[in-house]
């Protein structure tokens, strides 16, 4: 199960909507071995495409070095699908290289709502997992004021 702070969940959706009609991509990192996403890092889609994403290699190297320096690892690797459902494509599956990561897909194909789903992808096998939206901040503190968690499908801000 992916447990993610509401603020991080909202940042992923905001990034996906902002980059639409191109696919958005990024990572949320956390302490090694914690399975706790804490730091949101939106990345550039080097392809600038509505049907494909690829991290910019220089930016990715910088981010991965920074993670190493901070004893962090990618906990969530996310991207959006702009015209299809939030399910990994064959290309997404073939590029999944972090077996411990949660692969989040956000579909922005419908302007009225956003589909948000999480998967584990290990050795080409895709397993969907539940998503829990936490009221705690990424640092583990309760937010003030306290709000109810949003549904997994979020209305568009259009």
Give the ranges of each region predicted by the language model.
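Metallo-beta-lactamase
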Residues: 80
């Amino acid at each position: 199960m992916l447990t993610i702070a509401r603020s991080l969940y909202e940042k992923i959706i905001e990034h996906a909507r902002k980059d639409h009609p191109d696919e958005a991509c990024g990572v949320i990192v956390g302490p090694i071995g914690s399975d706790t996403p804490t730091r949101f890092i939106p990345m550039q889609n080097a392809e600038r495409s509505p049907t494909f994403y690829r991290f910019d290699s220089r930016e990715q190297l910088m981010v991965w070095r920074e993670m190493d320096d901070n004893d962090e690892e990618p906990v969530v690797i996310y991207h959006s699908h702009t015209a299809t459902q939030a399910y990994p494509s064959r290309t997404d599956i073939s590029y999944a290289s972090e077996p411990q990561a949660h692969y989040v897909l956000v579909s922005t194909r419908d302007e009225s709502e956003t589909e948000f789903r999480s998967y584990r992808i290990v050795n080409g096998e895709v397993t969907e997992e539940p998503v829990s939206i936490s009221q705690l901040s990424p640092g583990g503190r309760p937010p003030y004021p306290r709000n109810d968690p949003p549904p997994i499908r979020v209305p568009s801000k259009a």
